[in-house]
């Protein structure tokens, strides 16, 4: 047993993991009937098969539970591929267990991270964009239209370190042993 994410009287997610085999399983459980159906069965160390995390929202009691809209849940994943990391949002029909990819980040010189689903019905999400030289900034993005609007404009506070480069130092110790180090 690894945890339960409650949804409503018809749906909850139950996870189990086994350390020795690195196997993790997730089931859609009907709490009312006790019927469970397997939706994820994978090696926890296989980043390419990572389905992501289910989107949670506050319920009427102020508790975060699985967001369910017309028997559908939404998953945000890191999207590792052989070509790079392309975060995604996927819709899972909890009745049929069919998946539908709603959004996948495009290849860019900036790394995109999905921070939050704001309104899945409208397609509004919050993302973060950054690079090796550009500090992370937040954007409101609509996955239906593709439009995005900058929310923050934080300048890299470490700009003075941008010109710093690695250097390998080679030297000889007093006893004659050659040593090297990266500075």
Task: Identify the role of each PLM range.
Residues 1-17, 23-26, 36-43, 64-65, ...:
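Non-catalytic accessory segments flanking enzyme active sites
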Residues 43-49, 55:
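Blade-loop segments of beta-propeller domains
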Residues 52-72, 115-117:
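Signature of short aromatic-glycine-proline-rich micro-motifs recurring in repeat-based ectodomains
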Residues 72, 90-91:
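A general secondary-structure boundary signal
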Residues 73-74, 125:
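Entry beta-strands of beta-propeller and related beta-repeat scaffolds
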Residues 78-79, 89:
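A cross-family structural signal marking well-folded subdomains
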Residues 81-83:
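Long, low-complexity regulatory segments enriched in Ser/Thr/Pro/Gly and acidic residues
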